[in-house]
């Protein structure tokens, strides 16, 4: 289902807000995460405006990560505050993305995103501890084996879900779609090499450790099984046999 949603910029504010609600973000006056509707609205607006010049890290990417977060939350049976936090973190995990590889310090991009979100979170009256909690979640999306990220992933179930949501499209979508996303990322980040090789390398990297959450592993296994069933159907059809 997620693969049918276009990966494009712009993704309108209205569509992005609707995807957040679909993923399970509560709609009362103050979400169970502690954010007011005003705060959530400002975060959605900022996310929808993200990176008009970026080929990959734009609002379309945010939409797909939010959808993945919703599916993972459902699989993990998350409700209330935890689900709201996961969806909000997925929405804002790449705010103010540079649109290129950063040569700056480790976690630079994640801290930039956390800083942009913190201004809104605290500025609309939420507890500073909530901003710190969101920052910890965002650090989990850095593709590094640094000891800080390893410790966060080991101790924080929501961080494991967010890290999986961030890469879920690349490891679970049909190969042609995943390859298209890789082309966008290659152009944006100016990564040398062919898209096929980059995707293969990334899949091998993920394959060494697997996804971080039980929910992610279950959904990935289901996606792989569905793709295999489709391939089997095509193979049977090619022999001229009836497919039930």
Language-model-detected regions and their locations in the chain:
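Short amphipathic alpha-helical interaction patches enriched in hydrophobic/aromatic residues
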Residues: 24-27, 48-51, 73, 96-100, ...
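Eukaryote-skewed repeat-based solenoidal scaffolds used as protein-protein interaction platforms
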Residues: 25, 29-34, 135-139
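Inter-helical turn/loop segments and adjacent helix faces that build the functional surface
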Residues: 76, 102, 120-130
């Amino acid at each position: 289902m997620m693969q049918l949603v276009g990966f494009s910029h712009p993704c309108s504010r209205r569509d992005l807000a609707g995807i957040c609600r679909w993923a399970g973000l509560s709609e009362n006056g103050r979400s169970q995460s502690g954010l007011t509707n005003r705060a959530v609205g400002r975060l959605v607006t900022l996310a929808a405006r993200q990176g008009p010049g970026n080929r990959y890290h734009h609002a379309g990417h945010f939409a797909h990560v939010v959808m993945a977060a919703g599916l993972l939350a459902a699989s993990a049976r998350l409700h209330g505050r935890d689900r709201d936090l996961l969806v909000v973190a997925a929405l804002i995990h790449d705010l103010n993305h540079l649109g290129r590889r950063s040569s700056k310090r480790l976690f630079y991009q994640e801290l930039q995103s956390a800083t942009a979100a913190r201004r809104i979170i605290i500025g609309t009256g939420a507890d500073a501890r909530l901003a710190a909690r969101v920052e910890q979640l965002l650090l989990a999306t850095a593709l590094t084996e640094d000891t800080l990220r390893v410790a966060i992933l080991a101790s924080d179930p929501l961080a494991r879900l967010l890290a999986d949501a961030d890469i879920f499209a690349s490891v679970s979508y049909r190969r042609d779609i995943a390859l298209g996303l890789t082309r966008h990322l290659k152009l944006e980040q100016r990564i040398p090499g062919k898209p096929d090789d980059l995707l293969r390398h990334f899949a091998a990297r993920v394959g060494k450790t697997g996804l971080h959450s039980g929910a992610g592993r279950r959904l990935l296994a289901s996606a792989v099984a569905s793709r295999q069933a489709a391939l089997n159907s095509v193979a049977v059809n090619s022999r001229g046999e009836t497919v039930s």
